[in-house]
């Protein structure tokens, strides 16, 4: 057996480690309203996002073009011009651009798709 074939065999065995494959989950919705401050209000209710991890493995895609990482509360402490997803209280998920208008800066309107992946 050549050296390359032996190496390829090791790679193959490593890829069959039980539990190595991770199942991706997602929630799909859309922007239903733009607030007076430019936040993008979605139709994704707290019952849908309640069990979503609040870590960097969670990604939110808006209008198939803009992405942010993680879910935050209203007390987020993120720097200016950071796009964040706020999942807090009884309100639906909203996308917020710190100290600016997400709708204007991203060019997103009601009807745009929103997807949470983790």
Regions found by a protein language model. Name each.
Residues 1-44, 48-54:
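Anionic-ligand-binding alpha/beta catalytic cores of soluble enzymes and soluble regulatory domains
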Residues 26-30, 79-84, 112:
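Short small/polar-residue motifs
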Residues 37, 90-92, 111:
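A generic structural motif
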Residues 43-107:
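A conserved acidic, glycine/proline-rich C-terminal tail/linker
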Residues 112-118:
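Surface-exposed interaction regions enriched in Ser/Thr/Asp/Glu
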């Amino acid at each position: 057996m050549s050296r390359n074939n032996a190496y390829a065999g090791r790679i193959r065995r490593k890829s069959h480690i039980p539990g190595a494959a991770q199942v991706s989950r997602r929630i799909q919705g859309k922007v239903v309203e733009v607030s007076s401050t430019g936040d993008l209000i979605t139709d994704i209710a707290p019952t849908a996002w309640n069990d979503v991890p609040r870590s960097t493995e969670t990604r939110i895609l808006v209008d198939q073009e803009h992405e942010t990482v993680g879910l935050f509360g209203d007390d987020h402490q993120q720097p200016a011009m950071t796009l964040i997803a706020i999942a807090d209280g009884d309100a639906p998920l909203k996308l917020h651009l710190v100290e600016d208008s997400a709708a204007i800066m991203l060019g997103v309107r009601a009807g745009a798709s929103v997807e949470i992946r983790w």
